[in-house]
Amino acid sequence: MVVTTATKPHPFSIENILKSASPKPQKPLFSYNALIAMAISQSPLKKLTLSEIYDFIIETFPYYRDNKKGWQNSIRHNLSLNKCFVKVPRHYNDPGKGNYWMLNPNSDEVFIGGKLRRRPGQNGGSLESYMHLKTRTSPYQRGDTVCKRDRVVYLSNSGAGNCQFYQPVPCSSPTAMLSRSSLIVQTSPTTLTIPHHPPQNYIQTLSPNVSPVRVGNQTSPRQSALPSSSLPLLPSPPSLPSKLSSPPLPSLSTNLPSPPLDTGDILLSPFLRQTVDSTSQNFLEHMIRIREQVQRSGHLALAQSRAVVYQPIPRKSL
């Protein structure tokens, strides 16, 4: 029995010399997605299985024939992760194994120059879409954009029926808008607040431009010169008498002097003077009587506490 052993070819054999002389195939510049799209688009049915895609790549590009490490896994990953490839189940009458892969007709990517590129003119690539985005930018950018602002209403001298509106004005920067808003705050009327205890000897004014005046001296506030930018104030309400008359009170049993009560100390603001009627006057008179009675009763109690009652001390018998 003769045993033959396989011998390795000599490194300087003819086969090795021919292999070294022939140029090695270069790796193609196409991406894996482009290779898959090329294989599917050149098939007659426009669909291929995974093994058929492998066969097309090996037959078309000899580089992948000799280097089978890694690229087949990359083909599988690109088929499952890329949205431009769609898996189509095999029909039950179709013999064979594996599903088919097709190109997605709704995909935004096309095969251009060996790479899958997005179609021009879609997804904001055109000039019209760019101009549309420019028009939707913030109103604070530089340009002739109009800042929309709510209208501000001021009351005029003729009453609430005639109102003065502030129209929107164009502004080109945030600083201009801030300056305009500050102007509105300066010229807007002051909010009227009614305190629980009015300040003594001076009336409550509607605006800092009106100087305070005693009620007993003048019946209406004296208005100072207004600047040209300020708005006219409301007409002054009708004046009221400086002092309220109260009926005489019954005398008490004590002869202690009571402090004088001057009803002129209770001052009214212009808003209150305009809204006071007969009912409120009666209420004020009633409150004045109560305060005077409380003051007199306090003086009586103070005098009784200070009074010394004389009681004779009995003498002890010696």
UniProtKB/Swiss-Prot annotation:
Expressed in uncleaved zygotes with increasing intensity until the 8-cell stage. Confined to aboral region during 16-cell and 32-cell stage, afterwards found in ectodermal derivatives, in particular surrounding the blastopore and along the tentacular axis. Not expressed in the apical organ nor along the esophageal axis in mesodermal and endodermal derivatives. Expression subsides after hatching. GO terms for molecular function: DNA-binding transcription factor activity; sequence-specific double-stranded DNA binding. CDD domains: FH_FOXG. One of its GO terms (cellular component) is nucleus. Keywords: Developmental protein, DNA-binding, Nucleus, Transcription, Transcription regulation. Residues 220-233, 241-256 have a biased composition (Low complexity). It holds the Pfam family Forkhead. PROSITE patterns: FORK_HEAD_2, FORK_HEAD_3. GO terms for biological process: regulation of transcription by RNA polymerase II. Residues 193-258 are annotated as: Disordered. Its main location: nucleus. Residues 201-210 have a biased composition (Polar residues). Residues 27-121 bind DNA. It comes from the Eukaryota. It is found in: Nucleus. Probable transcription factor. PANTHER family: FORKHEAD BOX PROTEIN G1. This is Forkhead box protein G1. It comes from Mnemiopsis leidyi. The lineage of its organism: Eukaryota, Metazoa, Ctenophora, Tentaculata, Lobata. The gene is FOXG1.
